[in-house]
Amino acid sequence: NEEWVQGRNHSAIEIFNEVLKNHPSGTQAEEALFRLGEIHHFSLNNSTRALIYFQEVLQMNRMGPFSYPTQKYIAEIAEFGLKDYDQAIIEYQNLINHYKNENEGSDHQYRIASIYYKKQNYEQALVELNILLENYPDSSWAEESKFKIIEVLYTLSRCPEAREQYRHFTLEYSDSRFKEDMDFVVASCLEEEGHLQEAYNRFKSLEGRYIYPAILKMKLVGIEQRMKKNP
């Protein structure tokens, strides 16, 4: 392990292969395969090879001491390395189903919701975010999930629901870090529904506070032009 930390990957690989030769099964073999997976994943940037090692760990012992971190790596490689989103969803679901004791279910549920969002399957993203809130109400992801729900509702042109959720949210989290983003979403809803003056006032109130001033400026100019056309 020390040799790997010092960056001498190939030497470490030889050592772990030697361990596997002498101990083809059991905890030492599981650790050797796990470490080989980590070396290929992090140091050699070979996620495909790493995946093979990680899968071998699980084949050897699905409930062993290395199985949970291994399953996490497999899910992350599927999502971020291979961008195989359908497989990633399966792997995160495996984490939720098989490792309840780890108390990280809400993290994996949030990843599933995020993947559906990335896939632009907003209806399913909404379902997954609501599952997160139902199953893990005290999760550290709760606040962000509630914000994401408002964002998704706006994306789905379900503005009355988005505004309703916004009202609940502001009562629950009076000084949320998502406040500006949510105000922007609600202003966009008002604009979409044709409440131009109200939308304009909301956008205007975000000046100096919103993280993307250029987009805000574009919104204000766009509404000004629409109001000139339809006074």
Say what each PLM segment does.
Residues 1-231:
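Acidic, polar-rich low-complexity tracts and alpha-helical solenoid repeat scaffolds
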